[in-house]
């Protein structure tokens, strides 16, 4: 709330906020009136932020990283030495575990190809970590909390720029399966966000059979065709994915639909079952 308004308007905004968050996890949250220009109550906001508890980090499980962005590079741009080694730098979020310098890791799904019979084949990539950075700090190991840059030594033809986006990095044999279909228990939004239609209709509308939607799992965005709709409330949707992804049960999912020229969020959910690629295909 900003206090550069009248007292009556301030009280009205406060009531609007209370109504908006009623029945949610934010219903008991603090509402602090501030003035960024006059710096009123900024100290109160900082004090409240300092009392937010630190999340518990899982340091004992095998490490798992989700890649948000990847670029090709030369090792000289990562660490200061005379080695002329090509590498791929992955900007990733470490979800759990500890990843160490020099550790052997696996990248899933890895290289995705199609056979002559149009069947999908996935080949995981095995490599090792040659550098770790957090901002400008070189690391010997990385723990969960914030982004980390991981330099991987491998052939750049296998992992060209941006091709690692949405991939999962971890200990060989400890990563989730590669899946081609997922069943998501969906919860659709009550109305579209930031969408104005000429007819004034802001409803999301039901998910339709054979509809193409955009599915976001972790940092991976992939098209998904609706092939089945089940459940007591028709909220269990099976998506046939355009490209294999690496995920497991209970992963959080965002579902979007193309509306006009833009893609808009229409719902969210979690994975309740998957269809994996056989081990013989990997």
Model-derived regions: residue spans:
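Conserved C-terminal guanine-recognition region of P-loop GTPase G domains, centered on the G4
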Residues: 1-28
């Amino acid at each position: 709330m900003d206090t550069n308004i009248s007292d009556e308007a301030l009280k009205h905004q406060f009531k609007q906020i209370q109504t908006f968050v009623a029945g949610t996890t934010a219903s008991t949250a603090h509402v602090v009136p501030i003035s960024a220009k006059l710096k009123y109550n900024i100290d109160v906001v900082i004090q409240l932020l300092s009392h937010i508890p630190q999340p518990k980090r899982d340091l004992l499980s095998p490490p798992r990283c989700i890649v948000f962005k990847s670029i090709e590079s030369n090792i000289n741009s990562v660490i200061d030495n005379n080695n002329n080694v090509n590498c791929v730098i992955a900007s990733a979020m470490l979800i759990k575990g500890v990843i160490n310098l020099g550790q052997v890791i696996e990248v899933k799904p890895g290289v995705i190809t199609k056979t002559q019979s149009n069947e999908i084949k996935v080949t995981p990539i095995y490599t090792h970590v040659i550098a770790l950075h957090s901002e400008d700090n070189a690391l010997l190991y990385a723990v969960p909390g914030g982004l980390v840059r991981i330099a991987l030594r491998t052939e750049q033809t296998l992992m060209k720029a941006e091709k690692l986006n949405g991939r999962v990095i971890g200990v060989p044999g400890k990563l989730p399966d590669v899946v081609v279909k997922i069943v998501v228990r969906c919860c659709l939004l009550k109305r579209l966000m930031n969408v104005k239609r000429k007819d004034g209709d802001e409803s999301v509308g039901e998910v339709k059979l054979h509809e193409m939607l955009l599915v976001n799992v972790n940092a991976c965005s992939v098209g998904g065709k609706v092939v089945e709709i089940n459940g007591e409330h028709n909220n269990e949707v099976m998506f046939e994915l355009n490209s294999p992804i690496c995920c497991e049960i209970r992963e959080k999912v965002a579902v979007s639909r193309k509306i006009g020229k833009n893609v808009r969020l229409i719902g969210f959910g979690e994975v309740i079952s998957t269809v994996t690629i056989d081990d013989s295909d990997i």
